A protein has these predicted regions:
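Ribokinase/PfkB-type carbohydrate-kinase core domain
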Residues: 64, 93-163
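Short acidic capping loops at alpha-helix termini that bridge into adjacent secondary structure
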Residues: 20, 71-73, 120, 151
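Beta-strand->loop->alpha-helix junctions that form or flank phosphate-binding loops
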Residues: 50-51, 71-79
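Active-site/binding-pocket entry motifs
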Residues: 5-12, 91, 104, 130
Length: 163
């Protein structure tokens, strides 16, 4: 559960200031975990919200093409899909710029996931990035409490970036 965003990855090395060509990719650390779990043969369901825009369409289609259950990805007509621009500097470090103000994945609500059920064999994976708003934190708490009651394993990725 959590952030699902477009990563615009630079085609060459250099800072974002120096880069002028990007390739659109599906991104978000928890989404990457979900896809890899599916490739390992696990059932995979993603819980989030994206904008009712072309970027959201691309992300849902990408996860669906990987076999991920997208039935719990909500769509918002009022909020955009999150975007990130990333390049690789000459020293190998990544250079990020995020566009996540008033984006759909930061405004998930418990009501979006009332029908989600967990069981003992499940894993609920989430990261710190999606905890940036009170609404998202409350929703994560709601889902974590449901998962813990069901005996689900909770996995936290402290993938915090300050930019």
């Amino acid at each position: 559960m959590g952030e699902l965003l477009i990563d615009f990855q630079s085609e060459g090395n250099g800072s974002l200031k120096e880069t002028d060509r990007f390739v659109k990719k599906a991104g978000g650390a928890p989404a990457n975990v979900c896809v890899q779990a599916k490739k390992l043969g696990c059932d995979a369901v993603y819980l989030t919200k994206v904008g009712a825009d072309g970027f959201g369409d691309f992300l849902v289609a990408t996860l669906e093409s990987e076999g991920v259950d997208v039935s719990h990805i909500g769509r918002s007509a009022d909020l955009n899909t999150s975007l990130a621009f990333v390049s690789i500097r000459e020293n190998g470090e990544r250079d990020f710029s995020f566009y996540r103000t008033m984006t759909a994945d930061l405004y998930i609500e418990p009501a979006d996931f009332e029908d989600v059920e967990f069981s003992k064999g499940d894993v609920l994976e989430f990261g710190s990035v999606a905890l940036a708003t009170d609404t998202a934190r409350d929703t994560h708490r709601y889902l974590i409490e449901k998962a813990v009651k069901a005996g689900t394993l909770i996995c936290f990725d402290p993938n915090l970036r300050f930019n």
